[in-house]
Each structure stands twice: as C-alpha cells, then as structure tokens.
C-alpha cells in the first residue's frame, strides 16, 4: 500500500508574511476555501497573538472550513497558545503549532538561554497546547543549523510531552538535499519514541533547494511537507506545493508515496493566489508558469504533434489547465461566460456572474475577442474591488506630448456625487491622472510600489496595474485592470483609496472641495 504524505499549506501564514500589503479577511477566506477544494490536509492560516486582525481572520476561516484541519502558529509562550486556541476553537478540526528556536545561534543570541531551558520551554508549550487539543505540532526553528544531538533531544522531549507532529525546518534555506535527508534519517533512527509522531519538514528556498530538500526528506521518512501555493514566502520563498505534489505524482514509481490533493485544482488556486496576493508567477515557473507547457523549439513542436509524450512528462489537464477557447465575443451570452469559467474549474460561488458578465461585455466591446485568461483576471480583480466602494472612477482623459507637460481630466463619484478636476504637470499621463485624483480627494498618499503586467497577448492585452500606497503610516494595495494603461493605473489608485476609506473611516472628502 502506498504511503500518504500530509500536505500542510502555510500560504496564509508564512506566505502572507512576504506580501507588500496584507490581505483582507474576505480575500484570506477566499483562498482558504480554494485550498479546501484543492484537498490540503492542514492549512495554517495565521498567528493569532500577533494582531487583532490576524486573530479575527483565523477565527473566520476556522468557522468556515469543514474538510481540512485549520492550524495557527504560536511561540512557546502561554499567551500565544491561549490566543491560538481562542481563535481556533470554533473549527471542525484544528491544530496548535508551537515553535522555539533550537540552533546555538538563535538560542544564545536571540533567546539568551541555555539549551536545557529551551527544552523545558518546548515541553511546557506542548503540554499547554495539549490541554486544548490532541493535535499539537512542535517545530524546532532553524533545525537546519542545529546539531543533530540537540535536534534528537528536543524532538524526543516534545513527543513525550504530547506532540503528534514534529517539524524539522530548514528556516533559512541553508541545507543541501543529502545533508537535509540525513538529518531526517537520523531523527527517524535515533529518537526512541518517533513512532508516536509524524515527521514534518518546512523548507525555504534561499539556495533554490526547497523542493529537492522536501522530497529527499520524504525519501528518508518524513510524512508531512509544509509548503505554499506558488512557493510564496519570505525572502526567496517556501517549498512550492504544486512542485512537491506533482513530483510525487509524476514520479510515484520512484517515490512510492501519494497525497490527497486534487491536482486538477492546482492551476485555479495558483492563479487566485497570484492575483489576490499581487505576486506575479514567473513564466518559467515549474508546473504553473505560463511557459510550463509551451513548446517553442521547432524540433519540440514536431515531436509534440507526433506524440505529446516526447517532450511532456505530464498533461496540462492534470493541473486543471484546459486548452484555450477563442470564441468569446460581445455576442456571447451569460451561459457561455459561465461555461468558460466552469471549463477552467471555477464554481459559481467563486465569483459573481452578474458582475463578471457586465465587465466581460465592456471588455469584449473594446477587444472584440475575449480569452479565458481575461475572464479569470476580471473575476478575481472584481473580487478584490469589493461591494462597498465609496469612490468610483466616472470619466477620464489624459494627454501628453514631448513639448508640453501632461494634462489630465478626471471625474469621480463619491457616494454618488460627481467631483471633477483637471491637472497639468507630472511625469507623463499617469502622474497627471494621479495628481488629479489626489487633488480631488485631498488625501496625503505616498506611492511605494507600482507594477504593470500584461494579462494576455498582443496589442489588445489587458494591462494590470498593482500599486502599494502609504497613508498615515499604513500600506494599502490597489489593483486595476483595463486595456488602457492610464485607465488601469487610475482604477488601481481608486481601489487603494477605497481601501483607505474602509480601514480608516476617513472624513467625507466632499469637505475638501471647499478648501
């Protein structure tokens, strides 16, 4: 019988820490529900003690997830463990994940304790967590740089205290595959009570080894992999869920293990996370990159036409990537749009069909032909825009020449009332439009990030603008999508301002018209 590897997804905890701006609770829940459909065994969704916002998002997700175990992180500190329990207790099934650093560097420099003290703290933390649940995971942070004797000692103590999963993280992505596999093998062979717990691994990609290290660990006895969608995470990222899952599936002959992941959901979840997290996927990214199933070489194309197995070790359909259909136009009905979304694996509850169809018709009038990837972008950008936007972009025009400064005319609607202004100056039309919008709203905003990506191909491709702005010491994310770059830039700023209104309850900007 094939062994099963537990997939522990930490996109919403370790992955989210790497984002330029935090996700909203609604966006986190959307991702959590997608992860549930993907079939992850455990999803780690936050660090409840870190902020009230994190506590509430963990609690909201815990309330909604029925077919996966919901986990939350806590340091080996009573208040952390108590907060994790309070946030998780509404869940159908939950896990408390507690950790403490184990490497000499961390123990001496950060904790300023002896290793004996650290073992004692780990034991106390696991025991406290066991008061709340019989599913407790213990991690020795920076295990990759911890001596093997100390790893075995703290793992044995944690299991004796009641830990049911023991995680051996390569926190800084320091290990090479054989070295890391040897650590796991020694834990498996030297810890006398190891049969009472699952060995877990959590790898970072600083040297590009996260996937290789995780798979080598499985070959040496690990039965849980901690990973994120698209490999998002701090610094160079975490182990990529899609890479380890597909490696174990495609090379089951060699690995001899399986997961309960529904791989046909991979493409869909990957796209959702990329859009909502404002983290573009590199084109040559394994499994989910836009080039992953593209064959540009003439020899490859010839081979593919004769027999696709010549250069393709897995089919795009395995990850839920369907062949592109081209025939969506302004004459296409709602059923056609719904059908295309269904072909890509999206259920009706994933998006608002009315809003998507309205947005589709506007785009189809401009582009003529709309592709599946356009629909996908429209569905998820709309999801981010939210229902309670006070500020709406009504009209826009911008003009720029070499001889004269750029000019812009902008008309906004605030709570239904029209506001309009013109601006002259700025470094090009986008800058002029931004100056006009900021003049109208009277908000003090500093732009800290601006990114433009093409969604689709050709001159009529959609341009997606992602921005991060700073207002009163906080960062807000905005995203806009249009065939015109100036329009998508304006939509992104309006989106960010609506986020500011919701977060800070800024005074009605109509008062600024009189100043």
From Swiss-Prot:
Listed EC numbers: 2.3.3.13
Pfam families the UniProt entry points to: HCS_D2, HMGL-like, LeuA_dimer
GO-annotated biological processes: L-leucine biosynthetic process
Keyword Cytoplasm: yes
SUPFAM superfamilies according to UniProt: 2-isopropylmalate synthase LeuA, allosteric (dimerisation) domain, Aldolase
Source organism superkingdom: Bacteria
Domain Pyruvate carboxyltransferase, first and last residues per copy: 5-267
Catalytic activity: 3-methyl-2-oxobutanoate + acetyl-CoA + H2O = (2S)-2-isopropylmalate + CoA + H(+)
Record InterPro entries: 2-IPM_HCS-like, 2-isopropylmalate_synth_dimer, AIPM/Hcit_synth_CS, Aldolase_TIM, LeuA/HCS_post-cat, LeuA_allosteric_dom_sf, LeuA_bact_synth, PYR_CT
Enzyme class, spelled out: transferase
Cellular localisation: Cytoplasm
Cofactor(s) essential for the protein: Mn(2+)
Pathway connected to this protein: Amino-acid biosynthesis; L-leucine biosynthesis; L-leucine from 3-methyl-2-oxobutanoate: step 1/4
Subunit text: Homodimer.
Name recorded for this polypeptide: 2-isopropylmalate synthase
């Amino acid at each position: 019988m094939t062994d099963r590897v537990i997939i522990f997804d930490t996109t919403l905890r370790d992955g989210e820490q790497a984002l330029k701006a935090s996700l909203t609770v609604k966006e986190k829940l959307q991702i959590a529900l997608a992860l549930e459909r993907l079939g992850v065994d455990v999803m780690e969704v936050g660090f409840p003690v870190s902020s009230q916002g994190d506590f509430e998002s963990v609690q909201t997700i815990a309330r909604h997830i029925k077919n996966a175990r919901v986990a939350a992180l806590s340091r080996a500190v009573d208040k952390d463990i108590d907060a994790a329990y309070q946030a998780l207790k509404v869940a159908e099934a939950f896990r408390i994940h507690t950790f403490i650093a184990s490497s000499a560097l961390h123990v001496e420099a950060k904790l300023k304790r002896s290793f004996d003290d650290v073992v004692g703290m780990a034991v106390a933390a696991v025991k406290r967590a066991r008061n709340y649940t019989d599913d407790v995971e213990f991690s020795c942070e920076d295990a990759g740089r911890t001596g093997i004797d100390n790893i075995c000692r703290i793992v044995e103590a944690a299991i004796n205290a009641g830990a049911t999963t023991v995680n051996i993280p390569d926190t800084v992505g320091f290990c090479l595959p054989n070295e890391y596999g040897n650590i796991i093998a020694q834990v498996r062979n030297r810890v006398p009570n190891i049969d009472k717990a699952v060995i877990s691994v959590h790898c970072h990609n600083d040297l590009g080894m996260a996937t290789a290290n995780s798979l080598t660990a499985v070959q040496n006895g690990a039965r849980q992999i901690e990973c994120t969608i698209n490999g998002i995470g701090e610094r160079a990222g975490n182990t990529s869920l899609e890479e380890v899952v597909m490696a174990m599936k495609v090379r089951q002959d060699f690995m001899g293990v399986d997961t309960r992941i529904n791989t046909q959901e991979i493409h869909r979840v990957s796209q959702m996370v990329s859009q909502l997290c404002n983290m573009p996927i590199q084109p040559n990214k394994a499994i989910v990159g836009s080039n992953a199933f593209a064959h540009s070489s003439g020899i490859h194309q010839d081979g593919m036409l004769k027999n696709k197995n010549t250069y393709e070790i897995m089919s795009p359909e395995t990850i839920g990537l369907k062949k592109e259909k081209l025939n969506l136009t302004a004459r296409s009905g709602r059923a056609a749009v719904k059908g295309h979304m269904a072909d890509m694996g999206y259920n009706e509850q994933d998006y608002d069909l009315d809003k998507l169809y309205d947005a589709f018709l506007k785009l189809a009038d401009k582009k003529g032909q709309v592709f599946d990837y356009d629909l996908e972008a429209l569905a998820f950008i709309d999801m981010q825009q939210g229902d309670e936007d006070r500020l709406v972009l009504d009209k826009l025009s911008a003009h720029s020449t070499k001889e004269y400064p750029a000019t812009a005319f902008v008309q906004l609607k605030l709570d239904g009332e029209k506001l309009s202004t013109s601006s002259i100056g700025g470094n090009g039309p986008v800058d002029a439009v931004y100056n006009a919008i900021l003049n109208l709203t009277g908000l003090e905003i500093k732009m800290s990030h601006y990114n433009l990506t093409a969604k689709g191909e050709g001159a009529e491709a959609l341009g997606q603008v992602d921005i991060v702005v700073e207002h009163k010491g906080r960062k807000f994310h905005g995203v806009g999508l249009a065939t015109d770059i100036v329009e998508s830039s304006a939509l992104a700023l309006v989106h960010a301002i609506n986020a500011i209104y919701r977060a800070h309850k800024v005074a009605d900007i109509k008062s600024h018209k009189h100043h």
